């Protein structure tokens, strides 16, 4: 088996996380998984949605978008079509759940964090890149809130990162780019904490159904890849 | 550990599938997983969406809805709010992918199958009940199409069924009802083929992250539960 | 003249009203006029719309929908089209006005009743079946509110029921099913109180205009039919 | 009983119909029922909606709107709210059905007539004024189409006109203005042909239910009023 | 050069402003620039939008619409299409900005003025006619508010009027009608105060780019034309 | 007078145009006017909109968007609000008109060019930066189309660039950043061709009206600034 990308099965693409990528947001990161490039910002606003009012807790919500020509063919702009598609809603719900798992909301105070992940260039794995990058922007945003005295403690429970794995020509591979993803039999997105637990596991058989042992092989590959991503996050945040 | 429902950890709720539930659709089923009740219809129309035209293949697409008072609190009607929510879109995409896995589209001819799953009463597990019930309606619809001479062979590759599993007070349990689902630490939806492969595996940690061995225990439970569902589908279709 | 249904001109279809059809709503009924089947729920919520705030009065509002394949041909789901059609809005306005006529709002307290009529299977007369069935669900819902101590007296002023009549091949007939309705020259929907007054009279000439004497003959037929419906409502509520 | 308007019970408001009110439309009329003023245009376009293609028949469809400050309180503009309300849709469906009753579609050729009724100033009875005025614009539009050689005969089967009647302080009155309408117990809109048949009868009890004899008294009053409207239409068209 | 309209280059069309055109609005005007006819109403409501609350200042906002057959070809009704087009939004923003320039908001009190400009018949220059006519309706509305004691002084800082100019066959012309506008190389809309300053200058090269000296010639023509419009406004308001 | 930015009145911000910024689009540029950063892509698709079919001509259309946190305060995402705002539509119409002025559509062949300008970071002047940057992406896209043999000649008639000017504390200044723009009395956007003609001139008095001589001073400043921008475009394209 040879990957279209030429990478070894367990090899991540070159990953880059650039902090303070834009100026206005409390946290702002450009994350690159190879040719996949996503701007992740975290914006803090005082106040919480109605269903949380008066409970002394905070909230985090996420939105996801792609520039129309982030992809090989131009896709219609969702703002001009007048609605977000099912894929967009599915992804932004995943990002929101994943990052909420990183936080202790009772220490966030009555603040809302808006995570915006906007894909500038897509080459597979945009949702997992978004989670991994937004996690860094989230840490930066919490530091800003702390300086403002807006927190009731340290809301950061754990780090979160994500990667995709798949079965390609019968073998598990890590961090699929678009050509690999298009041909893979199975596609699995995995979100983990730095303590080694799973937050989300979403696997889909595109062609043939997958077997328990294939699932386990993919999860092992994902676990290893995410461990590398945690190191990278730590290194970037240490700068 | 005692389940709120009083069931044993590996015990399904009483499942009932009533065929020919309504009169107009090519396939029409009422599926009940305990108090969860869903009407599943399959409607066949000649022709395919534009992206498939001229390829001699068919298509299947799914939509999902809940009656406003299917739930404990009345929810705003999506038709009057003017858009389907993210949860709805996510579920109907899952149903569509799952049922497409049952079919060989090249034998369906240029026909489109519309699967509609409408929840009359919700008590947890509506998406997995929808898939399991709609599979039966799909078989009935194919029989109607066959009689009409609209098929190019037998499009049915395999049966598909689905169930939810979770971790409740540290233990894996099968087929969660709403009170169990609300308190579970982890929620996992599993879609399988009758040959024993996975079509979809979607797990979410609601509270604590889950570990690989917990995932495997849940998958084993799901595999056993789905086996029972396949027997039930077969028995119902044999009538 | 022979009706397609084989019924006598003044003969209703078999009518069935099943109370407590679903579990969550304050009132919940399945109403069947022959093959027309509608789920009617009444949901009570504390509070009133803004235009009524502070007046000590309650409110009732209605919504109507059809499952996509309730009809012979599948109709696009209004939730996914992003708007309710004119027919839907017209019918739900009619249901709301009709049921409000049954109530003394000043005794309802500051509560809002949401009536949802969802057609599972359509065979003509869905709006009149909805009104007749929802009236029973409304009585049940009021009993629940009374037990909760949420009322300021008995808001039930009078019972309301509805039926369709028409001119078919020159003769007035009662309670048209779909094939009769499609061929009728005139279609008239009548809503009455159990004291014998009219709440709504909506007649439309589909083909030839109708004459005053035809209108009176249809109204007489409707009056008789609705009297039977009131007996049926009473019998069902007495159980 | 004294009407707020000071009119006798059977007395219409001053009615004026101004033809060729605007320049572009095939038919264009300003209709005034007292202070109610509506611009009615009829626009002809070659072609028919998809469901009629290839049948050699024409079609007529109607739309209705109010300028935001046509009423005592400004109402939000439907174009900026992003949807037409239920009342609007109900009225434009009524106008469309009423005017289609005037035409033999098989003689219209494959043309579509768009009737637009836009209320400039509202003082009760806008829907019946719209129908009565649009009928005149329709005759003018047919004359234009005839000159263009676009017709397959004379599509005009009969004239149509409409008026509202009601029960006010226990007595039937004709052609209610807004203050009368607000206080009436019953409101009845009647559409008739010049041959004396009913096209639409839509009665609603706003307060007390109405009795058959009240309905008949109202219909008699409407019949007389509409007869006057037909004379007026004829006089205006003769100019 | 001969204008299609036969007018001299610096000649306005016949302008008419009819006050109190409809009955309900605080200010209501029919403005006619030749065959262009627009109803302008100004509606006053107590209260201001949220972003202004508690500042003791008022607000003015504008909306613009066209009747579907105001134009040579019928245009789809924006209310039924479900959104206002870009041209509509652009024009109503221009009208709002222009009329706000006439007012000292701090003297308006916490009132909101809604300006509605609805084009009954279009023949070029609808936006500039709207501004010029709405200005008169605004003065009338302020007089009503003054009588009600709702003002904190005289909010009227200055009068505002607008006209279009263009380059037609190489020469600047004033107040273009539709045929002239369609053929003009450049189209320039100018809004001025009666003290002679510019509020808005919006020029677009439809064909060839325009030169500074052409711009200045057009501005001179506009200045002269707007001076005539101010005289006309004054005369109308003096009646 | 001292500009908040410290720049001389006639001084542009540092301008940077980075070609080939993303990989998929036929033309793709990152344009920076100081802290204002916009991604401009040009996508080519075969075919034209319906109103142009069969004329052998091409078309260019533009869309504009801002990332939610491109600004100081996070703005709601237009895709999730379900409609583009008036400002967005106004700007994208301006961009489209400006770039169409650069092209001879008859030489473009039946191709449509989609220009997408997405603001990553806003600091004033986003619309003029968009036009200036998209012009470069357009040239690159035309080169790609030429290589593909999709053109019928060279469609590039002239270069186009744009800048904003304003009156700040009584003096004309060039290329306003956000703090300058917020305080300026007048804001003028100017689009020119490299032959020195005006394509668009859009001036708005935010505070005091502006005088003809102020307008001329601003235009002179804009002309000089745009000349620098043309040099910059040329230099960038020469690389």
From Swiss-Prot, chains A, B, C, D, E, F:
CDD domains for this protein: RNase_PH_bact (cd11362)
Enzyme Commission number(s) of this protein: 2.7.7.56
GO molecular function: 3'-5'-RNA exonuclease activity; tRNA binding; tRNA nucleotidyltransferase activity
Reaction(s) the record says it catalyses: tRNA(n+1) + phosphate = tRNA(n) + a ribonucleoside 5'-diphosphate
GO terms, biological process: rRNA catabolic process; rRNA processing; tRNA processing
Gene3D superfamilies referenced in this protein's UniProt entry, alphabetically: GHMP Kinase, N-terminal domain
Residues annotated for phosphate binding in this entry: 87, 125-127
Keywords annotated in UniProt: Nucleotidyltransferase, RNA-binding, rRNA processing, Transferase, tRNA processing, tRNA-binding
Enzyme class: transferase
Functional description taken from the UniProt entry: Phosphorolytic 3'-5' exoribonuclease that plays an important role in tRNA 3'-end maturation. Removes nucleotide residues following the 3'-CCA terminus of tRNAs; can also add nucleotides to the ends of RNA molecules by using nucleoside diphosphates as substrates, but this may not be physiologically important. Probably plays a role in initiation of 16S rRNA degradation (leading to ribosome degradation) during starvation.
Subunit structure, interactors included: Homohexameric ring arranged as a trimer of dimers.
NCBIfam families on file: RNasePH
Sequence similarity: Belongs to the RNase PH family.
This protein's name: Ribonuclease PH
Species this protein is from: Azotobacter vinelandii (strain DJ / ATCC BAA-1303)
